[in-house]
Amino acid sequence: MSKDINLDTHITDLVNVFKWEDLKDVCLVVHSYGGWPGSGALEQIGDRVSSIVWLDAFKPENGQRGFDFASEFSRKAFLAAVEKGEPGRPSPTAEAFRVISEKDRAWVDSKTTPQPNGVAIQPIKLTGAREKVAKKTYIRAAKYPQPAFDQALAECKADKSWRTFEATESGHDVMVDAPQWLVDVLLQVS
């Protein structure tokens, strides 16, 4: 990991996958932090995306930063990492993400990696490409407390161009807690 990694790095990674794989007519599904690079990438690849699914994800607006929405745990971890000169901070645990099964929590924790500090401090540059996608869906994981996701769900419910779903029996990692439910929803909306 490098101190040079920022939000633009992740946006570029996503854009390049679309370009190099010549992807078109894609249903772009983003989860959690993925709402940031997903929103940024749509500014460049929106014409290749036929539908989007924001899965318990941030829905940033122009000029916002991830740090502005961070939980107390994430803010403390970020500031501690910066103070120590570390390029990244630990990921929250699966327990903090309210993963339901103890076995699944152990598996998720074995797969998480630190997140680069730079992704939280760079403001995002958006012109509205996300809102131009014809088919938009927001899925909220009901058992994970996150005010920014509650706000995103409320905004999407109020905007008739978005479909909304709530994973009532799932923590933040819906793909772990309710995989078949998620597959059914994705097939319905993509």
Region spans (language model):
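Short, hydrophobic alpha-helix immediately C-terminal to the catalytic nucleophile
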Residues: 39-43, 183
